[in-house]
Amino acid sequence: MMTRVECFNPHRWIILHVAIIIQSKANAQSFSPSPPDLQTGHTPSKTTVFAVLVTLFFLTGLLSVYIRHCARSNPDSSTRYFRNRANDGSSRRGGLDNAVVESFPVFAYSSVKESKIGSKDLECAICLNELEDHETVRLLPICNHLFHIDCIDTWLYSHATCPVCRSNLTAKSNKPGDEDDGVPLAAMRDHVVVDIETVEVAKSHHRRLSSEISGKFPRSNSTGHSMDRFSDGTERFTLRLPDDVKMRLMAVKGRRLKRTRSFDVDLTAEHYCRSGEESSNTIGSGAKSGRVNWPDRWGLTLFVSKSNSGSVRSQKSNGEPLK
């Protein structure tokens, strides 16, 4: 039996090798990594947009820092803005009307400093600064709290309550002596009586009450604060005046009072020495009263009467010295 021997065919081997090479190249192309731009997903357009956004963010930060720096260098600018908006008579955002705000009395703090009840210095509850003599202040008659005019006007632009006690400032006060619209301004100027004896009694009573409270409530070990200081928390913002002085303030409400000798009554020895010549005609041996002629800017003549009641009276005169 003869064995069949197949002949070697080189054409088949060539075709097989070519097919293997082509298959290997196809597999290599399918598994080759993509270009960097396609792999990361970044394109030149996206890079430009990102750079623009970063630049805008940086410029916005610089602008905010610049605006804050300008606001700190000129702190009164915001106050002027709110005051101008308030004076326009436009609609307020939850605040009081312009007419209501102007009805609250405005005056110099020096005009009531000597007449106030209590020896402690007053502070503004909004800025927490001590009130100076030359500063203009505004009084809230309902609660007797005193503020700088710029501070309280800015507050009342968006609020209708007192910043200290939260009293509703839109409600009219019915307390006697707070406001008397029936009394004309001319009548109030003609006759003003300040009872010094009442003021002194009130001051002594206030000092005695403070000493009693501080004696009954010693320093607390748990809080480190005394009860006297706690009870006096709002007193440093409260202006307490005699009824007559407060009536005079309400009579000229909404107007800035100038410092006048007829209102700033100061019974000191210096005033008596300066006016000794005018009072020499009225003070004699055994006399119980002495009058000092002090003409003021309102055309009033102020004289001091040292009587048993201890009162100081101001009456209108025609400018002639009293005899």
Swiss-Prot record:
Residues 210-229 are annotated as: Disordered. GO terms for biological process: protein ubiquitination. It is an enzyme of class 2 (transferase). It comes from the Eukaryota. It catalyses: S-ubiquitinyl-[E2 ubiquitin-conjugating enzyme]-L-cysteine + [acceptor protein]-L-lysine = [E2 ubiquitin-conjugating enzyme]-L-cysteine + N(6)-ubiquitinyl-[acceptor protein]-L-lysine. Pathway: Protein modification; protein ubiquitination. The chain crosses the membrane at residues 47-67. A zinc finger (RING-type) spans 124-166. GO terms for cellular component: membrane. InterPro entries: RING-H2_zinc_finger, Znf_RING, Znf_RING/FYVE/PHD. It is a single-pass membrane protein. One of its GO terms (molecular function) is transferase activity. It is found in: Membrane. Its EC number is 2.3.2.27. Residues 1-28 form the signal peptide. Keywords: Membrane, Metal-binding, Signal, Transferase, Transmembrane, Transmembrane helix, Ubl conjugation pathway, Zinc, Zinc-finger. Belongs to the RING-type zinc finger family. ATL subfamily. The RING-type zinc finger domain mediates binding to an E2 ubiquitin-conjugating enzyme. This is RING-H2 finger protein ATL32. It comes from Arabidopsis thaliana. The gene is ATL32.
